[in-house]
């Protein structure tokens, strides 16, 4: 597709000519980016994901209609997603936005701003378009969705024009451009998976499901297995499937998730499954070192570069040459160091501290963070260009509370490890499994491991029972590490409000119960109480079960996927809580 410089069109004005509207509150844009990031990381078909993005845009911008159009290799509309019109293919795409408008944005590669569509020839090419409102004046803003200077599609909004109010084009274009950058990476990932035969793009006949094949489903691939990764929940299998695909490439991966979800473990798995598996795997925690030391650790230093530099030393980039480098806690590095790191990532070259010789490095980069980088970018705490450089393939690791069905298998595996290390033969009773399955585990798998080890160490017999757990003896202090507050997410984890930590792995509007939904029904626990920090209340479990069943139309198999359980477990829980299944 040929790119041409932007040219004025009838009824459209260049961005600089339009009066700058009043600045929207930064918090609104941050919240919008945060919600959109949650939608984009959720497992769903591309057209469903894009329709959800438009719905979020509609809730954060005062617009009348919004649309995202994805173009195929020939530049023709392939998918059109709107908030109020079901997503469809090429024929409907031309009806959502005039083809001339799509072509103009794709050809120029620039935003298109039209203060009054009735005065623009671009909007008169097709009679009675669905966005027409008769004599009501409509303004339009559209931006391209780009990736590596290639146009993948467009994002556009329109609103009823109010001559008495300023036209906030500048702010809208900036916000939509940020959204377009996020959307472009999702489109590229879906297309990559499509080429791998994993997930057809735009396929209408398949129901909305994660890309992971369900065990035993006819005509579907069996779940992918990675050594050491335990669990069959849909949330975890989605991650495993994505990891198995991206590992075969050299694409930069951004692992996101709360502390204790296994980011370093998955980074190691990506390396072991990659063509670089026989080369070094080097890791560094960026938050553990001051900026000056961090620069020396990553880039190396020459002899005499600073006090104490008594010999030349290779940095982590050099040590990982030909292999994989994991930068953990990437969100904690300073803005000054971000610029230095960006240069190395862009050029593949570096100089040691105190040196002048340029060294070329070939490294596959994996970054990890539990920080909300979108909010950090909006707050000017994290460089946007570095964010786009490291977030080529973002993978959100689900917290343990989103896959409670995996807790029994995880606990038994951790106990087996403890037994081998200590020459013991301990087992869990059914009551012990029930206690762990009801715990919230804000520290995720790491906290579960600590719980298993502590309980196994103090167990009174070879069979661990419920009374052996610290929470049953008013000795569990985990609740002191988190508390409810007034934040949108409702709790504090790792010292941050949930809304400031990470996008969850599923959108609030999607089929699964996200972290925020679970947390909203959980109250802070008394550290001196008799139960685990959360989810110990039968009332809370019952409410969550009913909510999932209602979302699933009272179909147990669908509710099981929402809760990360098996249909048999859901059926048992329904009987246990004496919930009558509705016949719809």
From Swiss-Prot:
Required for activation of most nif operons, which are directly involved in nitrogen fixation. Keywords: Activator, ATP-binding, DNA-binding, Metal-binding, Nitrogen fixation, Nucleotide-binding, Plasmid, Transcription, Transcription regulation, Two-component regulatory system. Transmembrane segments: none annotated. This is Nif-specific regulatory protein. Interacts with sigma-54. The keyword Metal-binding applies. GO terms for molecular function: ATP binding; ATP hydrolysis activity; DNA-binding transcription factor activity; metal ion binding; sequence-specific DNA binding. InterPro entries: AAA+_ATPase, GAF, GAF-like_dom_sf, HTH_Fis, Nif-specific_regulatory_prot, P-loop_NTPase, Sigma_54_int, Sigma_54_int_dom_ATP-bd_1. GO terms for biological process: nitrogen fixation; phosphorelay signal transduction system. Residues 458-541 are annotated as: Inter-domain linker. Residues 542-584 are annotated as: C-terminal DNA-binding domain. Residues 229-457 form the Sigma-54 factor interaction domain. Signal peptide: none annotated. It comes from Rhizobium etli (strain ATCC 51251 / DSM 11541 / JCM 21823 / NBRC 15573 / CFN 42). A divalent metal cation binds at residues 471, 476. Residues 1-24, 495-518 are annotated as: Disordered.
